[in-house]
Amino acid sequence: MAHKKAGGSSRNGRDSAGRRLGVKKFGGETVIPGNIILRQRGTKWWPGDNVGMGKDHTLFATVEGNVSFKKGFKGRTFVSVLPVAEAAE
């Protein structure tokens, strides 16, 4: 008798949603304290002046100012926030 074995189900067909990583505020943009500057896995970018780093390596502003990206020590890119000058009284 000619029988055909039952076909197995495919093991493909799944994918995970994108994690929405990357730069959220680019160089020169104005930020306020708490604004997320970028999301990353690991330390592709390092926190510079007036920037904090969360436990998931997210960089965020700690003061109001403009975002700045600079190359530094060991080829690392540092993200800083340059405070806006206070209005003269």
UniProtKB/Swiss-Prot annotation:
One of its GO terms (cellular component) is cytosolic large ribosomal subunit. Residues 1-22 are annotated as: Disordered. InterPro entries: Ribosomal_bL27 (IPR001684), Ribosomal_bL27_CS (IPR018261). The gene is rpmA. One of its GO terms (biological process) is translation. HAMAP family: Ribosomal_bL27. This is Large ribosomal subunit protein bL27. SUPFAM superfamilies: Ribosomal L27 protein-like (SSF110324). The keyword Ribosomal protein applies. PROSITE patterns: RIBOSOMAL_L27. GO terms for molecular function: structural constituent of ribosome. Keywords: Ribonucleoprotein, Ribosomal protein. Belongs to the bacterial ribosomal protein bL27 family. Disulfide bonds: none annotated.
